Design a protein with these regions (language model features):
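C-terminal motif of bacterial Sec signal peptides marking the signal peptidase cleavage site
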Residues: 16-19
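Sec-dependent signal peptide recognition
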Residues: 4-11
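Active-site-proximal mixed secondary-structure blocks
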Residues: 24-67, 72-157
């Protein structure tokens, strides 16, 4: 039984290998095609592109939106939202321990760019997006293709 299994695996591997062959493989002999251009950017964190997101929170009784590009997965049920502690939206997040993370599609880019360019301390951004209140009480953008309603567990400064 063990030999049949090994033979079947070998045959399957050969079939897959032959199915994945490409006629372009012979063209790769040309060394110019094998060279990729690289640029030395120095010692930087370069895990890009990151998804563009708009974070929503209630601040002083009004919805506020903040553009955030540093969002990542830190566990099977946890994400990390990284932003400067100087942002106006932080006070609402710290008070309520709630926020929404709204992915941005191409149609949303102009408004996302705008909310990322002005401070909620000086500008009312609550009407920039049509939204509804999520199950956890955070503002959720209606047009966003994917939304995460988040309850804050920890804040690191």
């Amino acid at each position: 039984m063990k030999i049949r299994f090994i033979n079947a695996v070998c045959i399957l591997a050969l079939i897959l290998a032959s199915a994945c062959k490409s006629d372009n493989a012979s063209q790769l002999k040309d060394k110019e095609m094998m060279i990729t251009e690289k640029k030395n950017i120095g010692s930087k964190l370069a895990l890009y592109p990151m998804p563009v997101t708009v974070v929503g929170a209630e601040v002083n009784g009004k919805v506020n939106w903040l553009l955030v590009a540093h969002v990542g997965i830190i566990g099977h049920d946890r994400i990390l939202v990284s932003m400067s502690d100087k942002h106006y939206t932080n006070q609402g997040i710290i008070e309520s321990k709630k926020l929404s993370v709204n992915l941005v599609d191409r149609k949303m880019l102009p408004k996302a760019d705008y909310v990322g360019s002005v401070s909620g301390a000086n500008t009312d951004k609550s009407h920039e997006f049509l939204f509804h209140w999520g199950e956890n009480g955070s503002p959720v953008i209606d047009a966003s293709p994917l939304v995460m309603e988040c309850n804050v567990v920890d804040i690191y400064k």
